[in-house]
């Protein structure tokens, strides 16, 4: 059972997990009381109690409630999923709405720098893609990385094609530019259990 909440008077989003629903509801009630003592309150639209976790799918199936809810947090959508061997796995996917917004922003910028030299455009797009991957390249998010890079390449090709009606850019030529300037999609971050297991000398 997950409790997702955010105080309404300041930005402090948080996700808290509980094994039992009764514990989650009791905590939520105590949190409301505690914040009320300081004239604060939880955001009514961002605070919710959802059934999520290893046994959520099985319990909801028995009750005829369908799949477990998903939730968004820090730019990712969290989903109850399974590995290829059928084991439970929490999957993280880049938020689709955030990705679309980022692509729209890049489209506008590409149009503004349409007539700049291709190497200058390539360098800029390299840092755009690398920056996106540095945050989003987590396990279970490979498809989103591929999709982001592909959409960047498509928008870049459109800009390069439009800036000169005489020069047509075929996909073979475009592929050379893509391979030269756009970093390939690959997972950069370890699984959470591997990261949390790291110990540092004192």
Regions found by a protein language model. Give the residues of each.
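Non-catalytic terminal/accessory segments
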Residues: 1-202
């Amino acid at each position: 059972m997950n409790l997702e909440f955010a105080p309404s008077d300041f930005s402090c989003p948080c996700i808290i997990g509980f094994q039992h629903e009764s514990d989650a509801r009791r905590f939520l009630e105590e949190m409301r009381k505690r914040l009320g003592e300081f004239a604060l309150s939880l955001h009514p639209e961002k605070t919710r109690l959802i059934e999520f976790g290893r046994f959520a799918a099985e319990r909801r199936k028995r009750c005829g409630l369908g799949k477990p809810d998903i939730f968004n947090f820090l730019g990712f959508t969290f989903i109850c999923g399974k590995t290829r061997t059928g084991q439970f796995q929490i999957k993280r996917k880049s938020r689709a709405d955030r990705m679309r917004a980022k692509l729209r922003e890049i489209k506008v910028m590409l149009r503004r720098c349409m007539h700049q030299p291709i190497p200058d455009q390539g360098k800029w797009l390299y840092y755009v893609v690398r920056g996106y991957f540095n945050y989003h390249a987590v396990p279970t998010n490979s498809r989103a990385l591929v999709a982001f890079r592909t959409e960047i390449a498509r928008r870049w090709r459109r800009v390069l094609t439009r800036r000169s009606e005489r020069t047509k850019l075929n996909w073979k030529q475009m592929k050379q530019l893509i391979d030269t300037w756009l970093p390939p999609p690959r997972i950069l971050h370890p699984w959470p259990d591997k990261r949390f297991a790291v110990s540092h000398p004192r």
